[in-house]
Design a protein with these regions (language model features):
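Single conserved hydrophobic/aromatic residue that forms the stacking wall/gate
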Residues: 154-165
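Short, surface-exposed beta-edge/turn micro-motifs
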Residues: 56-58, 71-75, 126-127, 138-140, ...
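Long, charge-patterned amphipathic alpha-helical coiled-coil/hairpin "stalk" segments used as oligomerization
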Residues: 82-146
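Charge-dense, helix-prone N-terminal extensions
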Residues: 2, 24-29, 48, 55, ...
Length: 165
């Protein structure tokens, strides 16, 4: 594991990655607004010179219909911060006809993270996850490290690893 000089306190996302052999690097910044995804993207672009399309946000959606036994009605969509999630497409990828954005308090309670810091990794309750196919275009992508102001440079041979960590 490689960390930046200003490493954050351990988060469940970092703990989940530490249990794997997937290389990653932690990048932190001072969070100064309520526009977490955009702010993170702006900071990472300026500080590291990365493409904004390499930076992914984690969105929690609620699927319509009754979930299978033991399955949550919530799911996670990981998409570039430069795009808007098409909720209907995410629902279809998860086998549902419809979905909507989950209420913030429900997303926070279920994942164990605060809005603006929800990570696809190390969630309190593991949710089904779909990842935008554009992740395949990059050797590295950035996702939330599990708190506001913490991004992970995530290097993996497969974005599918995001949904299993």
């Amino acid at each position: 594991m490689k960390k930046s000089a200003s490493s954050p306190a351990n988060t469940p996302a970092l703990a989940a990655l530490a249990k794997t052999s997937i290389p990653y690097r932690v990048h932190t910044y001072d969070n100064e607004s309520d526009h977490y995804g955009k702010e993170a993207a702006d900071v990472m672009v300026e500080r590291l010179g990365v493409e904004p399309e390499q930076i992914f946000k984690t969105l929690v959606i609620e699927l319509a219909g009754k979930p299978a036994p033991g399955e949550s009605p919530l799911a996670v969509a990981v998409v570039p911060v430069t795009t808007t999630l098409t909720v209907k497409k995410a629902a279809a990828a998860l086998g549902a006809s419809k979905a909507h954005m989950a209420a913030v308090d429900l997303a926070e309670k279920t994942t164990g993270y605060v809005a603006g810091g929800i990570s696809p990794l190390g969630q309190k309750r593991k949710l089904r996850t779909v990842i935008d196919e554009s992740a395949l275009l990059w050797d590295n992508i950035y996702v939330s490290g599990g708190r506001r102001g913490c991004c992970l440079l995530y290097t993996s041979p497969s974005p599918r690893d995001l949904s299993t960590s």
